[in-house]
Curated annotation (Swiss-Prot):
Pfam families: Hyr1
Protein name in the entry: Putative TAP2-associated 6.5 kDa polypeptide
Organism the protein comes from: Homo sapiens
InterPro entries: Cell_wall_rpt
Task performed by this protein: May be associated with TAP2 isoform activity.
């Protein structure tokens, strides 16, 4: 669990920072975009760690 915690926080911070740079006329999109990004990232991280465990 601790392996995913730090990358998730970094990803969330990065996404929030990028979104704050580009004001959108549709603020409600931020939430759905944020969820899609975090879910995709979590799946990719899980696949990466599974591969790392397999190779180790």
């Amino acid at each position: 669990m601790s392996l995913l915690w730090t990358p998730q926080i970094l990803t969330i911070s990065f996404v929030s920072y990028i979104l704050s740079l580009f004001p959108s006329p549709f603020p409600s999109c931020y939430t759905s975009c944020w969820f899609e990004t975090s879910i995709t990232t979590e799946k990719e991280l899980n696949q990466y760690f599974e591969l790392a465990k397999f190779l180790a």
